[in-house]
């Protein structure tokens, strides 16, 4: 069991020891926002916020501009936001500063380990539209960046907590580590009115692969089984050097494809040029999706199929692997969302080789702005640990999770969470574990 844990940590957390590191000319700006394809006027921030996942920098910043569905409104900050709007309108530039602390507590832990963990992440992000701001422009080009500082509050790290402290083959609060300074995004995004685009640079692949509404570990579910690929994809780390393209094939059908360096290291990103061009170890993916409502709601009302392949990594002794993932999500009555998502992996370094998640969400103020507003989320997952990573004959795991995000103000939210983990695969002593969490977000 200890060997399996160390191997998982090597893949996900010790990327700084990989030769080189980092990647991305990433993926998929995928296609251009539909309104962009229909209008030749100057692009606005909200138009930029329509493609990519909820955690892409433009989408996240746009959600922070929403001023409804809050308990309080701080009037004294209005001049500050008006100043930011003026900068955006005049220069095409805007930014956000966010701080995310998290605390986790488990009902039991393995001998010699702690039963709680806490850390925090500071994030500074922004985008600058340098091309296509004229009224008659037929394309736009935008520079996007996201820099983080990840630091611990306790000896245990939330990102490693589930695996190390109670033998659960998975991650809870996956980005909450102690990497220190950490590059997540630095890429160029080009879009055309015909509905196609590309992104190239250092990107977070999870912004563009298997995108759906409640995917964010910063604002939504804590457990990775309710996020990208339901833990069945062998994903690169942040700041992966790669290239992606995408576009709308029809009014309601889109295609995304890309490849990224598997040896990315967000703490030393520019070494990614060496690993990208020398090691040739890539994560490749193609996704076709059908939007069941309007394009600007594509990650809310969506059915998509993602196929992926990860090359063998010689340095860390991980076999090549491949898999498929199918996702369905649908909103109704403006406030409710339901989802059913599942996939499989053959070999590779994914946590699970089979995984199915079902559940829903409820937002009293309406499902819409990603990661913003009061919101209830709940889900159930069945997962089978990956034999190629952990070894054979492990029990299947079952996960139940529920959270409620309280939007205190536009700048501050708090999200309590509870999880019930059944048959943690790497824990021979316990047949179930309770995990309690508290996460906050402060943003300006």
Predicted regions and their residues:
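Transmembrane beta-barrel strands of outer-membrane/channel proteins
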Residues: 95-103, 143-149, 198-202, 257-261, ...
């Amino acid at each position: 069991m200890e060997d399996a844990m160390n191997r998982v940590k090597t893949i996900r957390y010790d990327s700084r020891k990989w030769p080189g590191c980092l990647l991305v000319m990433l993926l998929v700006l995928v296609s251009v926002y539909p309104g962009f394809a229909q209008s030749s006027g100057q692009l606005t921030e909200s138009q930029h916020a329509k493609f990519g996942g909820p955690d892409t920098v433009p989408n996240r910043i746009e959600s922070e501009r929403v001023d409804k569905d809050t308990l309080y409104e701080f009037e004294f900050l209005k001049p500050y936001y008006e100043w930011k709007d003026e900068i955006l309108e005049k220069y095409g530039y805007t930014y956000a500063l966010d701080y995310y602390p998290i605390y986790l507590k488990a009902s039991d832990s393995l001998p010699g380990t702690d039963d709680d963990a806490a850390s925090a992440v500071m994030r500074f992000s922004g985008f600058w539209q340098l091309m296509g701001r004229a009224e008659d422009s037929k394309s736009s080009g935008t520079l996007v960046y996201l820099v983080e500082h990840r630091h611990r509050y306790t000896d245990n790290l939330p990102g490693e907590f589930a695996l190390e402290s109670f033998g659960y083959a998975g991650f809870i609060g996956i980005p909450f580590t102690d990497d220190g300074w950490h590059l997540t995004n630095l890429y160029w995004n080009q879009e055309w009115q015909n509905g196609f685009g590309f992104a190239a640079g250092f990107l977070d692949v999870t912004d563009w692969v298997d995108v759906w509404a409640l995917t964010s570990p910063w604002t939504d579910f804590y457990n990775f089984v309710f996020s990208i690929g339901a833990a069945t994809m062998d994903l690169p780390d942040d700041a992966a050097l790669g290239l992606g393209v995408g576009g709308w094939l029809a009014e309601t059908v889109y295609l995304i494809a890309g490849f990224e360096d598997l040896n990315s290291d967000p703490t030393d990103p520019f070494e990614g040029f060496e690993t990208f061009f020398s090691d040739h170890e890539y994560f490749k993916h193609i996704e076709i999706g059908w939007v069941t409502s309007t394009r600007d709601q594509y990650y809310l009302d969506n059915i998509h199929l993602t196929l992926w392949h990860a090359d063998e990594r010689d340095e860390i002794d991980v076999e090549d692997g491949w898999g498929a993932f199918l996702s369905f999500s649908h909103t109704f009555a403006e406030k409710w969302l339901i989802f059913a998502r599942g996939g499989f992996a053959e070999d590779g370094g994914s946590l699970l080789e089979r995984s199915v998640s079902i559940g829903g969400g409820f937002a009293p103020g309406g499902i819409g702005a990603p990661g913003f507003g009061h919101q209830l989320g709940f889900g159930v997952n069945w997962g089978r640990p990956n034999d190629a990573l952990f070894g054979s004959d492990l029990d299947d795991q079952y996960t139940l999770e529920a959270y409620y995000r309280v939007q205190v103000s536009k700048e501050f939210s708090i999200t309590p969470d509870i999880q019930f983990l059944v048959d943690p695969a790497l824990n021979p002593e316990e047949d179930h574990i309770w995990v309690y969490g508290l996460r906050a977000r402060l943003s300006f």
